[in-house]
C-alpha cells in the first residue's frame, strides 16, 4: 500500500492536512507494518518495495509505505504554486532530483557514464517525439477532429452506474 506524500494537497501543506506526524503511522493503527522512505532515493525506494513485495509473496500480508517526496511543480497546469509556497522552499529539500541522484550514484559505481546517459536521453527524446507525431496524425486539440461530447461516458464502465446514465441522458436533451 503506497502513499505518495509530495507534501502538498493541492495548495495545503501536508502538515495541515493530517492529524498525525506522518502518513506511515496511519498503517500502524490498522496493525499493518508501516515504513517511510525517501521517495527521491531510487535505491532506498526499490529496497523497501522489494522487501514489501517479498513479504506479501510469503503470505505475510500488506505493508504500508509512505513515499516521502517533493512536488517540484504545481498540482496541475492551472496551478500557480508561487501563490502559496515560499520561493526558496525547494532549497530545504535534501537530496534533490532523484534522476540526478541515481545517475551520480551509478557513475561513481562505474556502472554508468555521461556518454551512455546522453545517448539514452536522446533515444528517449526521439521516442517521445515520434509518439507525439504519430498521435498528432489522429488530430490534436487545436485542429481536431473532436469526438462527440457523449464519448465521455463510453469506454469507462463495464456497467454504467445509474447516476452516470442520468448525466448521459441529460446531455442528450
Language model region names:
Residues 137-173:
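C-terminal intrinsically disordered, low-complexity extensions immediately downstream
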